[in-house]
Amino acid sequence: MNPAFAQPMMRPNLPLRRPATGPSSLSPRGPAPAIYEERLLASDVLDGPKIDTMRKDISQNCGDVLSSPQTAVSMMGQVVKLCNYCSHQGNLRCTRCKKTCYCSVACQTQDWIAHRHVCKPSIPEVTSEKPKESKAVPYANGLGGTQAKEISVDAQPKRIYRRDLHKKVVSKGSEIKGTVIDLRNPGMFSIHCQCEEMIESLKKITQQLQKTYCSSFAQEYKPEVGELCAVKFSLDQNWYRAEIQAVDVARKTAGVFYIDFGNEENVALDHIRPLSENIDAVPPFALQCCIAGVKPLTGSWTGECCIAVRQLIAGKSLTFTVLDIMNDGDLLAVDSLVSTLGKHVSTFLIDQSYAIKEDVPVKTQTEHSISSLLTASFENFKRFSGGKNENSEARPPEPLTQGVGDSFTAVVTHLQSPSEILCQKLENASIIQQLQMNLRVHCSNTAASDDFRPAPGTVCCSLFSEDNQWYRAKVLAYSSEDRVCVGYIDFGNSEEVELNRLRPISKELLALATQAIPCSLAGIKSLTDTWSDEAVLMLKHLVCNRFIRVEILGKKDGRALVSMIDESSDPQASVTELLVNMGFAAIESVETKKNEPDPATSTEIPLSQPVVEKLEWTGAELPFDGQKVELVISTLKSLDEFYCYNYSKTDEHTLTEMSFELMKHCESERAPFTPIVGEPCCALFTGDARWYRAMVLEVCGEGKARVCFVDYGNSCEVDAAHLKAITQSLLKLPFQAIRCWLAGVEPVEGQWKKEAMLRFQALCAGQPLSGKVLSITEKGYGMELESAGQTVASVLISEHLAKPYGQVRQPPQIQPAKPASQIEDLPSLKPIDQNPSVEEPLKVSSKGAATTPEDLPVSSGCFPLNWKTLELSCSGTFQPRVAAVISPSLFYIMNPGQVNVEGLKAVMTDVAKYCSKQPVPNQCHPLPGASCCAQFSGDKNWYRAVVLEVTTKHAHVIYSDYGNMETVPLSSILPITKELLQHPFQIVRCALTGKEHFPVVWPTEVLELFGIQLSGGVLASFQGFDGTSNLLTLTQQSGQSDRDINSIILGALQKGQIKPSSKLPANVNEEKKDVEQKQTQPISSNKAVEQTLSTNVEKPALDDQTLPLSVSLKHEEPENMSKTKTAEECTSTPDTVSSIESSHAAQSCCCQELKQKMDRIEELVLLLVKQVGSR
């Protein structure tokens, strides 16, 4: 083991340090005592004798200030620090926050449990350039002397930027007489104004900087890019104002620009200080300028040009005329008359062919240079090509087809810069290996021939100089008569080889597509005109010789704009983010890249006349105030990208009329059209041969373009002949397709599976949805969708097709691939917060169960929350038999209709077969509201059930076909299969009407009131079915008149206080008192009542164990339902624990025990408020 990483043999002490206000914290005048003080304050070990010794040392070194230790004590006698734990005098303090004091390690250890939540690292002290006047403290000897107490600043220094400085007023057309002090090129140079006021101001601020920072000592400061700091110049070691341009944290250096002198350099971080607020905020003295009206001929200023201009104007006093003000006043476009030449600088640049006027297009290279290179290469090729094999039939193979959004693992094969990367798919490694073997065999059987002279642009086999292996290569040019420049099309690199190292290639070897994928990192750009060598080296270190996850975000100039992530790193980070954070690149919008037209391919599409008017358009929007809207999904690409439209009859009618006008416009439009990326147009959809509004996404080759139909969201590639220009009148209606993504979920395995897509499509496609906006990002609207009363995200989570966003996936506790006999038992005790949440239900594999032809189809079991309940069909009022009460949003009644006895008997038989073949039950933790199989304690048989509550060891269930409840151990719970849920439960899930006004968490008083109301005679009226629950209106029968329970509950919610009814029967009042006495229990009162009946619990409606299903007939006779009576007795006492009323609400809590404690605290607070209010 490396001793540098060896663990210490002794456990380190908690962070304690001596307080700065103690007797030994006075900062001495000499340098040596400061060192001793720092060691003392940083000490983590409490040693009494050692501290005393150090006190003596400090006293001796501070002899010029303190006459004796007693003097120091008397001086600081006014400051007393108390231990944060025991309140005794504490002379030690936490080294982390440097604020909390303690008297010993023992007290600090006891207080650490609470203190760690507020203990934050202290901010390094910054020495102020102007110390505050300190209060004079008399000496103990009474001589009248004073001792100033130094005040240290713990506050974070304020960062200062250019915007915080005063603006220099320079008007357009004004003349400035100045001297050029620094010149990089004609597009960037600095001048100093020649005036006495500027010279005096510059001298003054320079003196302020030297006075503030020359003698200061501070810790290393980490500036931000764009911040103004005080920087020590390397040549004269003086301090000047500078702007931070880049920060290299690894090398502890930063690139700075001296704003008062115009030059720049790289300095160490310890030579940088935060700029004090006391430094005058005068504008930069160096005015940044550029020569107006010109730009470089070849796209960048050449070295020859810079030298000529430097000799012409550098260090000379000239009169500059301000022709334009750019970059919010930070850059002045100027020109000056050079007296020695008799012409302006701009004219000189144009005359010397260094620059051209701004309105002339720039060419990256002159036509003469390009022509010379092509001519030389062609002459070298044709010189000895007469009658030889030019390999003209071997054309380059097609490139690999990649689409935006594709993601794959790749290996970088060649890299020149972040804008020029070539990589190979890792999944094609075996194909490439086989290709290399075929090339080796082919070339070994093909002899070299003097007759073979391939033409530029053709493909052949080339022997690579480094490993002497054969590869497919494209002939780029002839550098001489017998040497050729080739590019290896499967790897991206190129080299110059001799002609005798080339071989002709067969058609079979050209069948495979080009394996090198040209890429560029999306979203970043170089800090200068070109990428620096340091940036390229860092990128090679990050991506070369390792597996990289590549995702295609767009396309530009024939390259894929990608993001790259090294999945082997910990933590995983984007290469783009790393380059930006390390100061090697700047952020650039990806959308800008996508919207730029490809000049190489746009010319292949017929040109149209330039558009005279500037088109303007808008897109449909969704409210972001929590309002639910009706949506219809029109295009589904994935759960992270789908398009929908806000369903409105008015907009639908308008869209129909606009489509008719669009059709007439396209039939009459005859002018050719040139597609431009990011511009709208009319496109013909080949699916139905109709015209629609579209947006150009990409200009492809062969006269085609890729468009997105803006009212529906789908995209396709169309011919240029099927594109028409659009008019402004057809753009008045906002684009109807709204890009959305499903919020709150993410893929289980990193990518969305096909099953999740199909399930999402089944829930949402082609039907109205209820949606609410949760967030807005660059991906569109993050939506919460409801389909048929179900939250789509909750359904996907409960079916194990998605997981909550940001949740760390726990390893499965039961391996599905193992036989049932090999499943290990879970521990007998398991904290509730380790249970699988509603998003990840447990699944049990049943592959190990023996099957016979008459057995059920075996499928994996789970604890589904979205089990389907019966939909009532009652036309009038009826008297419900309440089985269990959770809240007004969720309660269960027995099926008031006829029971299908034969179907129920078959289900019971299937349940018995399924459960008998399961392994020894594990202590699974289903969530409240989930369906399951439960073993009845009366006869040890298995029945279908619904979980009401769960603790660490037990579950409170209701038997879904009989209505009685009991508490069973978790070992008596098994998952249930989808086949066993086909037959509907005999308990019916219900809710009061008006659910949209109900809260997520119900007040305890309202739950108590609702339980009391249901304890008497109740009549119900069916109002509808929302896809999840039957909506009922309940009426309480009370002698003279009926009372609407729905109105009572809504009124109680609105008033916020509960007034008990004076007409309640006496037994109800007693039950209410009994409820108040039982509020201290951590479980519901329903459960408490059932525990009193646990000794006399009957099995689920079974009178004879030999006939397990015969008692099902008792559902037809209400008077014989003893279990219903038990249920009614239980429901007369309401739940004191707020149950989760939907699967979506359950996702927000992962610890039931903590939730119960919080509910209990809320009850006590409400009780206290009521008592105070009554007084």
Curated annotation (Swiss-Prot):
InterPro entries membership: SNase_OB-fold_sf, Tudor, Tudor_domain_containing, Tudor_TDRD1_rpt1, Tudor_TDRD1_rpt2, Tudor_TDRD1_rpt3, Znf_MYND
Name the UniProt record assigns to this protein: Tudor domain-containing protein 1
GO biological process: one example: spermatogenesis
PANTHER family: TUDOR DOMAIN CONTAINING PROTEIN, TUDOR DOMAIN-CONTAINING PROTEIN
One matching Pfam family: TUDOR
Record CDD domains: Tudor_TDRD1_rpt1, Tudor_TDRD1_rpt2, Tudor_TDRD1_rpt3, Tudor_TDRD1_rpt4
Subcellular location: Cytoplasm
A GO term from the CC aspect: P granule
Stated family: Belongs to the TDRD1 family.
Species of origin: Danio rerio
Biased segments, Basic and acidic residues type: 1115-1128
Binding-site residues for Zn(2+) 2, renumbered to this chain: C94, C97, H115, C119
Ranges for domain Tudor: 222-282, 453-512, 674-733, 925-983
Function, as annotated: Plays a central role during spermatogenesis by participating in the repression transposable elements and preventing their mobilization, which is essential for the germline integrity. Acts via the piRNA metabolic process, which mediates the repression of transposable elements during meiosis by forming complexes composed of piRNAs and Piwi proteins and governs the methylation and subsequent repression of transposons. Required for the localization of Piwi proteins to the meiotic nuage.
Region (Disordered): 1-32, 827-852, 1060-1089, 1115-1136
